[in-house]
Design a protein with these regions (language model features):
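Conserved beta-strand/loop scaffold segments within soluble protein domains that form the structured core
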Residues: 1-158, 162-165, 175-180
Length: 180
């Protein structure tokens, strides 16, 4: 398991630009978790993965930006062997004037299956760009992408506020649950 974690109050220049390359042999498996909850002013995470037959890759990303922070997440997954599978999932929240880009590309070069998903909550003056991309080079490559960007639903806030939470507390509860 690989985990990138950034936290803090967002003051100063905190920059995180990791590049991860993964080469998976037949029958191998790997799970990666990336978690960044505020605290990093600028990040550009790039991940490249090459999977041979029956290899399994799971990537889970949880991201929250605020202030003027920027975050770029790039994933290039090549499913090169029969039975290779990949699941790349991102959940993110952009607050204040922050900006996020999620760019996930899955290429199926063999009978394989791949899935990428990006679910985001946008708040204030945030900016989110989701770029899910699929390429099939084999008739038996089964590839799926999903992307959704939206705001917190008013009825969710009202429900929590009727239980005694302030609007800010209700927003935090919703965000914390979403990023789990």
């Amino acid at each position: 398991m690989e985990k990138h974690y950034g936290s803090g109050d967002g003051k100063g220049q905190r920059i995180l630009n990791p590049v991860t390359e993964v080469y998976m042999e037949e029958g191998s498996s790997m799970e990666m978790e990336m978690e960044q909850i505020k605290g990093v002013d600028s990040t550009d995470r790039q991940t490249i993965a090459e999977l041979k037959g029956d290899a399994r890759l799971v990537v889970k990303e949880r991201l929250m930006t605020h202030g003027t922070q920027t975050a770029v997440s790039g994933y290039q997954v090549n499913l090169n062997g029969a039975g290779a599978t990949a699941d790349v999932v991102s959940r993110s929240v952009a607050r204040d004037d922050s900006s996020q880009t999620f760019n996930a590309r899955i290429t199926g070069n063999a009978p394989c299956s791949g899935h990428t998903e990006c679910d985001s909550i946008i708040m204030d003056n945030g900016h989110i760009l989701a770029i899910p991309s699929l390429e099939a080079n084999n008739v038996d490559a089964m590839l799926v992408h999903e992307a959704a960007i939206g705001k917190i639903a008013g009825d969710q806030l009202i429900k929590l506020m009727t239980l005694g939470l302030t609007e800010q507390q209700a927003e935090e509860q919703i965000i914390n649950g979403f990023l789990r």
